[in-house]
Amino acid sequence: MKVRLLLFAQYREWAGQDEVELDLPAGSTAAEAIQRLRAEPHMSRLSAAPAIALNQVYAPLSAALSDGDELALIPPVAGG
């Protein structure tokens, strides 16, 4: 199944692009998609547990993915 990951801020800078498409086995979870992305050398700094939104709704990392899903990785917010 194909899942589109949307990258913002520092995640976009590390990847050099604003989205990545992953081909994952059926029944994969958001955590497994993130693990696959972290295996890329330029994305190894990515937290194993970033905030995520699945199809524009905040979701837990245990959320099951389906073909065509959009998974947004939300970077930490800093500042004051």
Residue map of PLM features:
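Ubiquitin-like/PB1-type beta-grasp interaction modules and other compact soluble beta-rich domains
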Residues: 1-79
